[in-house]
């Protein structure tokens, strides 16, 4: 019988493993917002699989649908062939998500991960424009494959490529330019000035909230300005909603409050409902220009994820979940503001929006230490930002009041303990 012992992982698993170092236990069961390890210790999950478990662990309706599908010998693997499960997912996505929002997109299944979705959007934007350069933004994160890394800002991640990452240009995200806080004017000058050295891009790729980059949240005004820049210059707009989408910020798509219409939308993580690998790329019909098989892959048709993903879409047949997320988001915001006020020694700044919020502190290792103390007390939470300077709250969007308050209480305890023990010195 497996014991709560990490020796097999430490001895045989690659050194590249990361999350197990921050959460050093062997997990065994999970339900809703709770996890249990082999010792029976219970944890509140404010991590949600980095956004892959927006609906929590083992949602009962999704689980029963999947068990029935397996018991009936439903198709498991089918590449991009037509299956009943796939057809039902496409139909539900059209009728529950796209049509009520007056959105017109073709649905591409590029592979199982968010990076696959990003790669497909980059390739297609370059194909339809005939240009190679793509503009990304400071602190953006889009995946670990070469194309996705090329539009990622994090130096540590980029160095892992082992080769030059070319045909991309990085411009300042909203509020990155502290001195003027007007990155739009800066971006326009770079695009229009013949001496800037910036080749006309095929596309801009942007996140509305930079989940890995430090929970930087772009304003709706800034996003609308980015869309306007693209439209006026025949530049395609790729919206990476892999982490911020599927309800994480309150609305199904994180860009809905801004009222913009991207040319390509990248979705993965929670699109499969229960954490099963699935990615889709939404493509404006006029740019659906790949020839059959021009972008393919073995795992484009995860039927298990189609089954659970279809069931998950039922949450969006009315506005109850959306309103619930928005109400609980206000509770998270008020809690974080209260912690910043009570502990000025953190020099904290609240970041993000919706169910992806946190506190940034310039105090070295503070966010890491708070996340570590949370784990000791039974709360799973990670950090974000180029220097891991943000501790990041990512509860399931289906969490109830009891679960949310329990998690916030543990976090408050961790903040109080760490700030009391530490000699806090800003970086």
UniProtKB/Swiss-Prot annotation:
GO terms for molecular function: diaminobutyrate-2-oxoglutarate transaminase activity; diaminobutyrate-pyruvate transaminase activity; pyridoxal phosphate binding. InterPro entries: Aminotrans_3 (IPR005814), Aminotrans_3_PPA_site (IPR049704), Dat (IPR004637), Ectoine_EctB (IPR012773), PyrdxlP-dep_Trfase (IPR015424), PyrdxlP-dep_Trfase_major (IPR015421), PyrdxlP-dep_Trfase_small (IPR015422). Its cofactor is pyridoxal 5'-phosphate. Pathway: Amine and polyamine biosynthesis; ectoine biosynthesis; L-ectoine from L-aspartate 4-semialdehyde: step 1/3. The keyword Transferase applies. Keywords: Aminotransferase, Pyridoxal phosphate, Transferase. Belongs to the class-III pyridoxal-phosphate-dependent aminotransferase family. This is Diaminobutyrate--2-oxoglutarate transaminase. The gene is ectB.
């Amino acid at each position: 019988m497996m014991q709560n012992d990490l020796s097999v992982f430490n001895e045989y698993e690659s050194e590249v493993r990361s999350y197990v170092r921050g959460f050093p236990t062997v997990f065994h069961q999970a339900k809703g917002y709770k996890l249990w390890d082999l010792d029976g210790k219970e944890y509140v999950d404010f991590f949600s699989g980095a956004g892959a478990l927006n609906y929590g662990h083992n949602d009962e309706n999704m689980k029963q649908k999947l068990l029935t599908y397996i018991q009936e010998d439903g198709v498991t693997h089918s590449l991009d062939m037509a299956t009943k499960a796939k057809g039902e997912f496409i139909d539900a996505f059209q009728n529950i998500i796209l049509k009520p929002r007056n959105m017109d997109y073709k649905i591409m299944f590029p592979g199982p991960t968010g990076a696959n979705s990003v790669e497909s959007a980059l390739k297609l934007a370059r194909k339809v424009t005939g240009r190679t350069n793509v503009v990304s933004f400071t602190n953006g994160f889009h995946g670990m494959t070469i194309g996705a890394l090329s539009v990622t800002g994090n130096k540590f991640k980029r160095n892992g490529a082992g080769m030059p990452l070319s045909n991309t240009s990085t411009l300042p995200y909203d509020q990155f330019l502290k001195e003027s806080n007007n990155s739009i004017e800066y971006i326009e000058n770079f695009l229009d000035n013949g001496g800037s050295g910036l080749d006309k891009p095929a596309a801009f790729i942007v996140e509305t909230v930079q989940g890995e980059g430090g929970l930087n949240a772009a304003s709706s005004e800034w996003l609308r300005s980015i869309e306007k820049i693209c439209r006026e210059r025949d530049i395609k707009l790729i919206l990476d909603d892999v982490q911020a989408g599927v309800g994480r910020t309150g609305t199904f798509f994180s860009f809905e409050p801004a009222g913009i219409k991207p040319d390509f939308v990248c979705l993965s993580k929670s699109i499969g409902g229960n954490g099963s690998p699935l990615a889709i790329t939404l493509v404006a019909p006029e740019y659906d220009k790949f020839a059959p098989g021009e972008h393919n892959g073995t795992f484009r048709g995860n039927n298990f994820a189609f089954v659970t993903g279809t069931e998950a879409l039922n949450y969006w047949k009315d506005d109850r979940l959306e309103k619930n997320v928005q109400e609980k988001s206000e509770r998270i915001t008020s809690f974080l503001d209260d912690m910043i006020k009570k502990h000025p020694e953190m020099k904290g700044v609240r970041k993000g929006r919706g169910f992806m919020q946190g506190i940034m502190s310039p105090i070295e290792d503070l966010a890491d230490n708070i996340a570590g103390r949370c784990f000791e007390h039974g709360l799973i939470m990670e950090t974000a930002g180029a220097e891991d300077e943000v501790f990041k709250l990512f509860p399931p969007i289906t969490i109830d009041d009891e679960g949310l308050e329990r998690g916030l209480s543990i976090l408050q305890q961790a903040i109080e303990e760490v700030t009391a023990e530490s000699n806090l010195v800003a970086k």
